[in-house]
Regions:
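Blade/loop signatures of beta-propeller domains
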Residues: 22-50, 170, 317-320
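Short, conserved, GDST-rich strand-edge loop motifs in beta-rich repeat architectures
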Residues: 25-26, 156-171, 310
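Blade-edge beta-strand/turn elements of extracellular beta-propeller
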Residues: 37-54, 86-94, 125-137, 175-194, ...
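Beta-rich, blade/repeat-based domains predominating
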Residues: 53-69, 94-118, 136-154, 170-175, ...
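Beta-propeller domains
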Residues: 69-93
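Short, solvent-exposed loop/turn segments at conserved positions within beta-propeller repeat blades
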Residues: 75-76, 114-115, 161-173, 212-215, ...
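A short loop-to-beta-strand structural motif that recurs across blades of beta-propeller domains
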Residues: 79-81, 118-120, 174-177, 216-218, ...
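Short loop/turn segments immediately following beta-strands, especially the blade-tip
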Residues: 220-227, 310-317
């Protein structure tokens, strides 16, 4: 009982702190800024940005469900919602500081529960089980983003960005991990300052992880032994204070990267060329491919979820075999 009470108080304090800080909402107009003509192979020049839902505190972790809704984490109200096509919101669970989400291959929702310092799996009724909360006996920092890999395992980042106030960091690094279906946990890299978003290439040969602190994106070779090798800088996203940092990552079927960053979403080709930027009204944290053809980007951006139609098809790792 005392433990549950303490956790409840902690959840309230986290939410209160975020509410006091308030979401930073830049006053920007939506626009598509092209750096290359290849950018227009991905978007119509007259594309319109739609508001899918609004009225949140701070949105994260979108996941499209084929039944016609999007899972959305709200880090201020500490809830995960189903948001339907008509904008209706339905609470799945109240959970301290939910962050990035993904589906596994069985279409079960996997969440980075920052306050629990754990990776959890939720059923359709919102009941959850902890899949992992420590490595070599030491608690995770604050798991941030998660993706299903080409081998069906769960991959996630563990920065200190949302380490609960008053709690100590037990691991002496910020890592990226692999959690296989048997529950075996493997540390893939610990050389990054604040690893955040991550994604795999459609051919399964490369993994991308951005570092919010260093404002860059790294690419790793994904080996046959399910490990990361030969990490190097893929691209950089410089910006001023308050402009946003590299965060969520998604990939299309051609291998182009869509990375939230300063002022919007930066679009990169396979060679690391910055093709252009989707400038958004609010600072985005993450994004997901959705609709039946997976040609629409659903973008969690501060108080809202936006949608943008594209001319390409998203790569959905949990549907890949």
């Amino acid at each position: 009982m005392r433990w549950r009470f303490s956790i409840a108080i902690l959840f309230v304090l986290v939410a209160f702190g975020k509410l006091c800080a308030g979401p930073q909402i830049p006053k920007r107009d939506f626009k598509l800024e092209a750096n290359s003509k290849e950018f227009w192979a991905l978007f119509d020049r007259d594309a319109k940005l739609g508001t899918f839902a609004t009225g949140f505190g701070f949105t994260e972790g979108p996941v499209w469900d084929p039944e016609g809704f999007v899972f959305v984490s709200d880090e201020v109200t500490n809830k995960i919602f189903r948001v339907y096509m008509d904008g209706r919101k339905e609470e799945l669970i109240s959970l301290g500081d939910p962050d990035g989400n993904t589906y596994d291959r069985q279409r079960r929702l996997i969440d980075c529960a920052s306050v629990l310092r754990a990776i959890i799996r939720l059923d359709r009724q919102g009941k959850y089980e902890i899949l992992a909360d420590r490595f070599e006996g030491k608690r995770f920092n604050s798991p941030n983003d998660v993706v299903t890999g080409p081998d069906g395992a769960i991959y996630f980042t563990d920065p200190t960005l949302d380490l609960p106030e008053g709690q100590k960091q037990e691991l002496p690094y910020q890592g990226v991990y692999r959690l296989d279906p048997s529950g075996k946990l493997t540390l893939l890299t610990k050389e990054m300052s604040q690893p955040n978003g991550l994604a795999f290439s459609p051919d399964g040969k490369h993994a991308y992880v951005d570092d919010s602190d260093r404002r860059n994106i790294l690419v790793f070779d994904f080996t046959s032994g399910h490990s990361f090798a030969n990490g190097r800088v893929f691209g950089e996203e410089p910006g001023g204070k308050g402009d946003g940092v590299p965060d969520g990552i998604k990939v299309d079927q051609a291998g182009n990267l869509y990375v939230t960053g300063p002022k919007g979403i930066w679009v990169w080709d396979l060679a690391g060329h910055h093709l252009g930027t989707i400038v958004l009204p609010e600072q985005p944290a993450n994004l997901a491919w959705g609709d039946a053809d997976y040609q629409t980007l659903y973008i969690t951006a501060t108080t809202s979820v936006y949608k943008l139609r594209t001319k390409t098809h998203g790569f959905i790792p949990y549907l890949s075999r």
